[in-house]
Amino acid sequence: MSTYKIAVVVGSLRKDSFNRKLANAIVKLAPPEFSFKQVQIGDLPLYNQDDDDNQAESVKRLKNEIKGSDGLLFVTPEYNRSIPGVLKNAIDHASRPYGQNAWARKPAGVIGASIGVIGTAIAQQHLRNVLACLDVPTLGQPEAFIYVKDGLF
């Protein structure tokens, strides 16, 4: 049986993150032919195109982990009706320099959890738009917008 390596990108740095808990729950419930690795994004410098020719070690690590995966799982909160800056920063780093997009052609799932009544619906749509630009095919259905209440995790 083949094992599919999935890179998990959690768009939250919060210690008690709902989205990290959601990612952990997905990993526990997944079929055995999937292996998951959460990629670290909190140590990346802010993206600056001037650094494309001399990328930080943390950026090189991120790009290698993405390139070594068979697929992606993005688990994102929603901040002010969009994705968190830390997630966009990671996406920008791994897509650069031009022509060296580590995300390209990696199939992806998108999910998220929030205390807002619409969950992460708008953040997920924004993320899907960004990923489409980067040639990342995303699973269109089903969509899951998780409204977090006490006791969910």
Please give the residue ranges for each predicted region.
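Glycine-rich phosphate/pyrophosphate-binding loop and the adjoining helix
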Residues: 1-7, 60, 137-153
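Secondary-structure boundary/capping motif
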Residues: 15-18, 47, 82-83, 119-120
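Short beta-strand/turn micro-motifs composed of small residues
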Residues: 10, 40, 112
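N-terminal beta1-alpha1 ligand-phosphate binding loop
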Residues: 2-33
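Helix-loop-strand module that forms the ligand-binding subsite of alpha/beta enzymes
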Residues: 54-135
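N-terminal beta-loop-helix "entrance" segment that forms/cooperates
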Residues: 41-57, 153
